[in-house]
Amino acid sequence: MSAQSVVPRFTVITLGVAEMRRSIAFYASLGFARKFQATGEAVAFFDTGGTVLALYPWDALAHDAGVPDAPRPQAFRGVTLAWNCRSEAEVDAALASAVEKGTNLLKSGQQTDYGGYSGYFADRTVTSGRW
């Protein structure tokens, strides 16, 4: 297979998480359907409507990638995941729902410079510590 025949696309986004049970419960509570129950808590896969979200223990993911497990930073790591909604009201409702489920609201819904409407919440199950 040549490099030209490889179709560029993301099929799985994997998050290294500090607490698998808590992370699995959190993403299920947001309404994402879990795929492949046979894996138990070793890894969790969620259907996100095209791309799969995978949760994997932080240290195991570092080991699998062949990189040292560094201390978990408490600052922004340069990655966000977008959840597109149909309206501003739906964005606000999604943010409120996430906060009710234990996340920290980082930025309430507001107009963006690029013509959208967005907000941010921090998934505390991905990292240990305070946001």
Regions found by a protein language model. Give the residues of each.
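Short amphipathic alpha-helices within nucleic acid-binding modules
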Residues: F26, A89-L95
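Residues at or immediately preceding the N-termini of alpha-helices
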Residues: M20, E88-A89
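N-terminal beta-strand motif that seeds the catalytic metal site of vicinal oxygen chelate
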Residues: M1-I24, F36, G78-W83
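Short, flexible, mixed-charge acidic loops at enzyme active sites
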Residues: D59-R72
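Short connector loops at helix/strand junctions that flank enzyme active sites
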Residues: T48-G50, Q74-G78
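Vicinal oxygen chelate
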Residues: S2-V6, L95-W131
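Core segments of cupin and vicinal oxygen chelate
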Residues: T14-A62
